[in-house]
């Protein structure tokens, strides 16, 4: 009951934040558009007005500047980081749900089909947000135990709101 309510409430919040901003998913991007926007941010300090969802570009540009690496390298590393976050989130969430020794491995195997989706090897904003969902669900699962998890859940909701076009 409570888990379903949390999922429905989170989805309601995500949808309502975008409706409150006055737009839904407007444009379709490919990976090279995201890389180009990140290059625009690095070279000129801003992104063009046509980039309605700049989260991926901003993250790539700022991370590349922080670690002094190229945008191309960041565009190669970000999908790997998101896949790692996905697998780690699935493992943590599975262990939080059940202590049965076969539950975590079976949940990991059950989560593998999403890795064959067409958008997975890209750096699109949808990929980043979808890959963070298991970690978000784990944080929601743990919200009743500590206020730290509630703060993390709030941060993740803001992250999803800014990063995923609905």
Predicted features and spans:
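Transmembrane signal-anchor helices characteristic of membrane glycosylation enzymes that use polyprenol
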Residues: 1-28
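Membrane-embedded helix bundles of polyisoprenyl
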Residues: 6-15, 56, 60-65, 78-166
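Glycine- and acidic
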Residues: 18-23, 44-46, 71-76
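Acidic/histidine-rich, surface-exposed loop or edge segments in extracytoplasmic proteins
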Residues: 19, 34, 41
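Membrane-interface helix caps and helix-loop-helix hairpins in membrane proteins
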Residues: 20-26, 73, 116-126
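Hydrophobic alpha-helical transmembrane segments
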Residues: 22-32, 75-80, 103
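Extracytoplasmic catalytic/substrate-binding loops of multi-pass membrane glycan-assembly enzymes
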Residues: 23-37, 47-63, 69-70
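Short aromatic-rich membrane-water interface segments that cap or initiate transmembrane helices
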Residues: 37-48, 71, 117-118, 163
């Amino acid at each position: 009951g409570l888990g379903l309510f949390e999922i429905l409430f989170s989805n309601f919040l995500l949808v309502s934040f975008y409706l409150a901003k006055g737009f839904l998913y407007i444009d379709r991007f490919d990976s090279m558009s995201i890389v180009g926007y990140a290059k625009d941010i690095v070279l000129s300090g801003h992104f063009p007005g046509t980039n309605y969802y700049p989260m991926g570009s901003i993250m790539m540009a700022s991370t590349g500047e922080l670690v002094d690496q190229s945008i191309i390298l960041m565009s190669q590393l970000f999908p790997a980081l998101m896949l790692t976050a996905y697998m780690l989130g699935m493992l943590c969430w599975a262990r939080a749900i059940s202590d049965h020794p076969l539950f975590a491995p079976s949940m990991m195997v059950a989560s593998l089909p999403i890795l064959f989706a067409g958008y997975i090897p890209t750096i699109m904003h949808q990929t980043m947000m979808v890959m963070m969902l298991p970690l978000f669900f784990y944080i929601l699962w743990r919200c009743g135990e500590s206020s730290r998890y509630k703060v993390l859940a709030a941060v993740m909701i803001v992250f999803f709101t800014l990063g995923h076009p609905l």
